Amino acid sequence: YTAAEEIERAGGKALPLVVDVRDEATVKGALDQTAQKFGGIDIVVNNASAISLTTVADTDMKRFDLMHQINARGTFVVSKWAIPYLEKVANPHILMISPPLDMKEKWFAPHTAYSMAKFGMSLVVLGLAGELRDKGVAVNALWPRTIIATAAIKNLLGGEERMQQARKPDIMADAAYAIFNTPARELTGRFLIDDTFLFERGVTDFEHYRVDPTKDLASDFFLPADSAPPPDVHT
């Protein structure tokens, strides 16, 4: 509920709900409650994720199932039941926090189960964007170029030292905001990188997004080799 409190302190309105995206009935109920409270649903962000960076040999099936139920299936279920609400509004967007479909061995070999689950979210983008294009519902993916200073990085993927090589979550928030302010029919089926998309929208200074400006930034997983950072900008 802390996120809801922060939203309301900033002048927004929030409806905090405890939702397990693996439970279809709970998802449907949450969407209905949200639509009733706010008069509709304009935007859906699929960000729920489970992670285990383990090899096939070291991944137990319970962990495998959890990642696929939350990442791929959860994204599918939430998006599926949000469609009837989104079709009723003027500028509907579905956004997955998932990577470009760069299907390379290097992304799978160290952690096949996680990569399958994460790319599963992106496959929903690929299919659903085509399915909903004629209905004017935008479906896109957003992925960070660098690691982002989140609890997952701090607690699971490198600790405080790694956090210093990250950008702040603000860059993803700003990129998402720019996506949602774009007419849905003009932006769909895209796999967007945060700083590249912001650069396309006129942002040229990315220095303030750094956690520690003195440290080199660390790249995130799944970044395609041909995805160059924006030219001539302060990263």
Write out the residue ranges for each language-model feature.
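C-terminal helical subdomain
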Residues: 141-142, 160-235
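A glycine-rich helix->loop->beta "capping" turn
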Residues: 10-13, 33-46, 52, 138
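Conserved Rossmann-fold SDR core element
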Residues: 40, 122, 132-144, 186-194
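Substrate-binding pocket helix/loop in short-chain dehydrogenase/reductase
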Residues: 55-56, 63-65
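The beta1-alpha1 cofactor-binding region of Rossmann-like NAD(H)/NADP(H)-dependent oxidoreductases
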Residues: 18-30, 61
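Hydrophobic positions on the long internal alpha-helix
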Residues: 30, 45, 78-82, 86, ...
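Catalytic loop of short-chain dehydrogenase/reductase
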Residues: 87-88, 92-134, 145-147
